[in-house]
């Protein structure tokens, strides 16, 4: 089961107040419902591929409106061939849609979220929970990027969801997609806040556990890569220094170097594996800092380059 499916399953087991049940059900019907007329009767089909969500819708309708509800199961014939669950409401359809502020008394469609549904903060959370159950998805935190989104068919509702989320300081953004619109979050901290808002506390803890391990692993990898790069740089510099010292020795002899450079050249040639700090401790006449040793080695490199360029050197 995917992380998103586990999150939704957890949400379908939450207990709610009556006002919150209405807010959640409104989002579910608005986003997953469709209307049909048969034998002069209006019916509502609420469709989902998640059995737990279908049970949730069925229970909320029975509990809130005491109506006859049918539950149908069909098999998709394309792609994954998953089961499709259809919760069918064949009585009081018009009254329920009006009560959930999805249609007006004249049966015209309401595209925004009614403020009456989300007056209380708990109802705002519940509407977002219903919207996530109906059209939401969230990436597994083990993947390369963090992403949570809620899909809506029309812009007004999508903008209303975005506004509702940003009322909780989530910094959500909207984007037009093929056949609809999405409100999305990209920051891991905002995704965990959203999971907390809608009541997915177990999913939140799992998300955070995986994220912490992942971020720690990435930090270790960055540290190792940095140390490896520094080590390669140090080894490369040491090999270059040794090669230049050998070139000077074979071309004109180390005696051509000033005494201080000659001593460093001989130490670097004889002790190729030691660090600059250790070289500084070997110098006669007192300890020299790493920067001091590095300065002398750069002078030796410059002399080697001058010799390669054909210049004649005289010991100073």
Swiss-Prot record:
Keyword Cell division: yes
Molecular functions (GO terms): DNA binding
Keyword Aminoacyl-tRNA synthetase included in the entry's annotation: no
Keywords: Cell cycle, Cell division, DNA-binding
Family under the similarity heading: Belongs to the WhiA family.
Role according to the record: Involved in cell division and chromosome segregation.
Protein name: Probable cell division protein WhiA
